[in-house]
């Protein structure tokens, strides 16, 4: 059995395995634990009562968190004409068509979100092998293929998170930076869960939100007592 590091021992001494924590208690406890040498994020994992093997039970969406994620988001937009001007005015870091595609094929992929207007998909479609593995391929289901690229840029910059159930029916996303006020962090999580409930698959039976777990980037996951959330 691997030997625990000093940091792991210090963390193990402070947490109770299997305990369901009040949200504010969990957030405060996680923030008090020994940290990595960078500003960690708060991450949420939500176990859903869905069968991800069934296409009609795959949960996929995007939502703008009321207090953002604390991250600086770089956005590239494929569009042209007046929409290009609107995207730049909304804060896009790069706007283009074939020129932008050439840059990305050449390895310039320093973006967190890629957005496209429908008429630009003829160009974006050639980038599937480049953008797909990085989770950057624009998709109408999460609002990144849209004629209203300006609003999509504003949402991305405001802290919109995108998520999709994994093979175990769990969604994972960042909900803020360590250092966020617990109240603001809680409101971000509540907004996310409200969105999950809004798009609950009609064929999902039984308990839908089965478990909510809060963690930091390098820290342990703490089970959240859902009664401490206003959802």
Curated annotation (Swiss-Prot):
GO MF terms held by the record: rRNA binding; structural constituent of ribosome; tRNA binding
Gene: rplA
Top-rank taxon: Bacteria
Alphabetical GO biological process terms: regulation of translation; translation
Assembly mode: Part of the 50S ribosomal subunit.
InterPro entries noted in UniProt: Ribosom_uL1_bac-type (IPR005878), Ribosomal_uL1 (IPR002143), Ribosomal_uL1-like (IPR023674), Ribosomal_uL1/biogenesis (IPR028364), Ribosomal_uL1_3-a/b-sand (IPR016095), Ribosomal_uL1_CS (IPR023673)
Keyword Metal-binding listed: no
UniProt keyword terms in alphabetical order: Repressor, Ribonucleoprotein, Ribosomal protein, RNA-binding, rRNA-binding, Translation regulation, tRNA-binding
Function: Binds directly to 23S rRNA. The L1 stalk is quite mobile in the ribosome, and is involved in E site tRNA release. Protein L1 is also a translational repressor protein, it controls the translation of the L11 operon by binding to its mRNA.
Name listed for the protein in its UniProt record: Large ribosomal subunit protein uL1
Protein family: Belongs to the universal ribosomal protein uL1 family.
PROSITE patterns named among the record's database cross-references: RIBOSOMAL_L1
A cellular component term, taken from the record's GO annotations: cytosolic large ribosomal subunit
PANTHER family in UniProt: 54S RIBOSOMAL PROTEIN L1, MITOCHONDRIAL, LARGE RIBOSOMAL SUBUNIT PROTEIN UL1M
């Amino acid at each position: 059995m691997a030997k625990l590091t000093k940091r792991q021992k210090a963390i193990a001494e402070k947490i109770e395995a299997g305990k369901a924590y009040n949200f504010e208690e969990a957030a405060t406890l996680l923030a008090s634990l020994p940290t990595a040498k960078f500003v960690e994020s708060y991450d949420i994992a939500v176990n859903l009562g869905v069968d991800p093997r069934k296409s009609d039970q795959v949960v996929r969406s995007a939502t703008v968190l009321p207090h953002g994620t604390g991250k600086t988001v770089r956005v590239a937009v494929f569009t042209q004409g007046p929409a290009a001007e609107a995207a730049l005015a909304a804060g896009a870091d790069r706007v283009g068509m074939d020129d932008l595609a050439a840059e990305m094929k050449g390895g310039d992929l320093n973006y967190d979100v890629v957005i496209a207007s429908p008429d630009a998909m003829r160009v974006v479609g050639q980038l599937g092998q480049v953008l797909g593995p990085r989770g950057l391929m624009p998709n109408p289901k999460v609002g990144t293929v849209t004629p209203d690229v300006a609003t999509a840029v504003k949402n991305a910059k405001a802290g919109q998170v995108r998520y999709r159930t994994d093979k175990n029916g769990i969604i994972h996303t960042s909900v803020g930076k360590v250092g966020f006020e617990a109240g603001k962090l809680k409101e971000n999580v509540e907004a996310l869960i409200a969105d999950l409930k809004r798009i609950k698959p009609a064929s999902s039976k039984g308990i839908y939100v089965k478990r909510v777990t809060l963690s930091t980037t390098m820290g342990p996951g703490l089970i959240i007592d859902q009664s401490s959330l206003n959802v």
